[in-house]
Amino acid sequence: NFQIRDEETFSLCIPTDRDYKILQLTDLHLGFGMFSGKKDKLALEAVTELIHRTEPDLMVLTGDSVFPFFPKSGTMNNRKQAEKLLAFLDGFQIPYTLVFGNHDCEMGSTCNKEQLAEIFTTGKYAVFTKGRYEHSPQNPITGVGNFVVDLTDDQGKLLLPLILLDSNMYGDGWFFSGFDRIHEDQTDWCMEKL
């Protein structure tokens, strides 16, 4: 029961007759490569157990879902990683959304963030859009995947807005520069949306 209202806002109808459960998953670092098979299997088993145990209404992946870093995963193909992750998540038939972390697109990976975002929009249960981003035709802001998921009741009344922001990658785009952050133009956009 979700629909996109505009390029940066989803509306997701939630049940009001019981508690609504959101499962947060972070830093899965799925590689789906020649060096990460055992680790990936353990991570997917743990996620499956969490989903069955908690029976969430929405899953929120908060960065570093995939890890296209050859020394750890044995591949730089984050396109394949994203497609496998979507197939896995869609199998549960539960809506999910996500934000990027610093490892989802490493230097030399197959897809940049905009390309990876296009893949994530194709998930059957994905509540995801590129939203307002660095190369938006109008009013660009830092990052990719800055958007809102408005949780509403069955009458369309807003119960809770979830603001999703790209925390970006590295300070100057390179691994050794240190982690980036949420930028002021992103927080300004948040204030506009609220």
Which role fits each region the language model picked out?
Residues 3-11, 80-194:
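Extended active-site neighborhood of metal-dependent phosphoesterases/phosphodiesterases
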Residues 1-79, 84:
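N-terminal active-site segment of His-dependent metallophosphoesterases
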